[in-house]
């Protein structure tokens, strides 16, 4: 093999979802840099990888970059894997790749399982356009800004089971979404419905595993500023506070909450 460094996609759940090429490379390289050696060791034992494993995660990636460059300079071959999917895509790897590119080290990437495409391929969609966010920020304001930015595009993101309900509560309850979990595993599940329906379902059912969410694109029926002001005035007359008005209007029309607040206090 002429290349010295390999980015290798690994299964996202089902251990059989690995390519023959990936197995061949992981059996051949001298070292495998892993997000978590314990996770990769399970794969190594199943397929007989004999390479030495060492950790390379978001907390030591800069330090490990130096080690990997040193190994390559010594003529060794190194593969980078994450716990699931492709390194550098919502996983550690981008810092290392930058360092390798700056050193003009040849990189070969091996494609494989991907949670986003596995999820999207099973969904009915009005259009093919989508924006992949990665892990959505925990901050509610940042979430609102992202959802407002992509309100006319199918917006796809990862979320943890512990935060899913809280994140969904920050989206208009009548917005159509899809939620996938445990993809490629025995208990794989995909639910499609309104935010309200999905919240009610997962309040009654166990929520485990990695989560992928798609917020369906809104129809492009923009509301004029005058109409927004009219709705705002109605709520003012009903005695709602500026904060509550901003929240209600932004969820009804998918508008940025800060934009609505500015209209409220004009």
Features from the language model and the residues they span:
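Conserved helicase motor
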Residues: 56-62, 135-139
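Glycine-rich, flexible N-terminal cofactor/catalytic loop recognition
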Residues: 1-58
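Short phosphate-binding loop-to-helix
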Residues: 58-73, 92
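Short active-site oxyanion
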Residues: 26-32, 104-107, 153-155
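Class I SAM-dependent methyltransferase SAM-binding "motif I" and its flanking Rossmann-like core
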Residues: 95-150
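A contiguous loop/helix-start segment that scaffolds small-molecule binding in enzyme catalytic cores
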Residues: 2, 77, 154, 158-266
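A glycine-rich beta-strand to alpha-helix segment
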Residues: 73-118, 164-168
């Amino acid at each position: 093999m002429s290349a010295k460094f390999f980015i290798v996609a690994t299964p996202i759940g089902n251990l059989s979802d690995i390519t023959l090429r990936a197995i061949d490379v992981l059996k051949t390289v001298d070292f495998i840099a892993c997000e978590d050696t314990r996770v990769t060791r399970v794969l190594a034992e199943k397929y007989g990888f004999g390479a030495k494993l060492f950790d390379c995660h978001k907390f030591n990636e800069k330090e490990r970059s130096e080690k990997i460059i040193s190994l390559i300079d010594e003529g060794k071959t190194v593969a980078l894997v994450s716990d699931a999917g492709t390194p550098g895509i919502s996983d550690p790897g981008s810092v290392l790749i930058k360092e390798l590119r700056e050193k003009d080290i040849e990189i070969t990437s091996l494609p494989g399982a991907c949670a986003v495409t596995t999820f999207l391929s099973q969904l009915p969609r009005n259009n093919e356009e989508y924006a992949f966010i990665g892990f959505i920020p925990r901050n509610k304001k940042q979430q609102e800004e992202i959802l407002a930015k992509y309100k006319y595009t199918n917006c796809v993101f990862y979320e943890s089971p512990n935060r899913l309900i809280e994140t969904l509560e920050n989206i208009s309850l009548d917005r159509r979404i899809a939620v996938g979990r445990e993809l490629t595993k025995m208990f794989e599940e995909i639910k499609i419905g309104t935010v309200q329906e999905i919240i009610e379902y997962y309040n009654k059912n166990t929520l485990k595993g990695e989560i992928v969410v798609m917020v369906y694109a809104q129809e492009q029926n923009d509301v004029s500023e005058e109409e927004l002001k009219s709705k705002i005035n109605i709520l003012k007359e009903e005695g709602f506070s500026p904060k509550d008005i901003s929240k209600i209007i932004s969820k009804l029309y998918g508008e940025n909450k800060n934009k609505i607040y500015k209209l409220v206090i004009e």
